[in-house]
Amino acid sequence: MTIFKRISSPALLALALFGGAAHAALVPPQGYYQGIEKLKTGEGNFRCEAAPKPYTGPLQFRSKYEGSDKARATLNAASEKAFRTSTEDITTLEKGVSKMVGQYMRDGRPAQLDCTLTWLGSWARAGALLSTDYNHTGKSMRKWALGSMSGSWLRLKFSNSQPLAAHQAEADLIEKWLSRLAEQTVRDWSDLPLEKINNHSYWAAWSVMATAVATDRRDLFDWAVKEYKVGANQVDDQGFLPNEIKRKQRALAYHNYALPPLAMIASFAQANGVDLRAENNFALQRLGEGVLAGARDPSHFKARAGKKQDMTDLKVDSKYSWLEPWCALYHCVGDTLERKHDMQPFNSFRLGGDVTRVYDPSAESKK
């Protein structure tokens, strides 16, 4: 099937028409080729839980910031509880797939792989998460889930152990569904005004990038790169993102939250011969350095955002998962490298699981 037959979005069509000549197949960073860590015999104590019910309803969810002012920085406990309840099956799928893929890549037990394929296959057959009846929180859940699933899928797809070789029909079904989700995600997040482009758009672009490589879709890859460039060019000379500064007391936390998708996109682009490191005068490096400095002394963020910073998230090691791809891009040394080593291993289900095993596998053996 040609790229033109698959495209249903004007944004993707434009990229397809002007994307140039044919390219080599898309690939992930080198760490995704790793095989099973240590093949275990027997079933062990792994038990395949029943798959969460495929979510096929409208993607209309309450925001956990419901009722907050325009800074969107104050949690609403009641609406957060409603959000968690209504999205529970989606989050269970994300976390479950990430965990099972991690277990399989560690142990190689067939039951772990079979369960992963059963879960994803049931959602793919149901056409889950494809509703076009959605609000902002709903389309946000769609792209988060897509990034989680495609990020995990990459570890199976490209592993030298070739776990999907004996499951090609199921893999094709799942990848077709991931492609459809990516196409809808492109429609969801294209053509936004600059003042509306923030961390959500970066996470959408990461989910599309992961899917692009998992399904070898150059049109999706090009869209993700385009969105990355928009994000990188939002970083000002001081390393701030104006649309995250608006989050007032959570400005620093949201700068930190913007980094994982941007760093992953740049890493995947580099693996395919597209070097984004210097975009907007090394914006990604500047952003990361600013967050690391802010985590130590948030006074600059307080001055810029006009509020004392909420440091809760900045004390959680896993929130710095972006350090793995970022340090691979910019070759961290000294204090930054030491901080990374102190916090490893990094595991983020929204990035597909154990990012330390992908980017710095020798570090895990030292723990």
UniProtKB/Swiss-Prot annotation:
Keywords: Lyase, Periplasm, Signal. CDD domains: AlgLyase. Its EC number is 4.2.2.3. Substrate binds at S63, K64, H136, T137, Y254. It comes from the Bacteria. It catalyses: Eliminative cleavage of alginate to give oligosaccharides with 4-deoxy-alpha-L-erythro-hex-4-enuronosyl groups at their non-reducing ends and beta-D-mannuronate at their reducing end. Its main location: periplasm. Residues 1-24 form the signal peptide. It is an enzyme of class 4 (lyase). GO terms for molecular function: poly(beta-D-mannuronate) lyase activity. The keyword Nucleus does not apply. One of its GO terms (biological process) is alginic acid catabolic process. It is found in: Periplasm. The keyword NADP does not apply. One of its GO terms (cellular component) is periplasmic space. NCBIfam families: PRK00325.1-2, PRK00325.1-5. Belongs to the polysaccharide lyase 5 family. Catalyzes the depolymerization of alginate by cleaving the beta-1,4 glycosidic bond between two adjacent sugar residues via a beta-elimination mechanism. May serve to degrade mislocalized alginate that is trapped in the periplasmic space. This is Alginate lyase. It comes from Pseudomonas putida (strain ATCC 700007 / DSM 6899 / JCM 31910 / BCRC 17059 / LMG 24140 / F1). The lineage of its organism: Bacteria, Pseudomonadati, Pseudomonadota, Gammaproteobacteria, Pseudomonadales. The gene is algL.
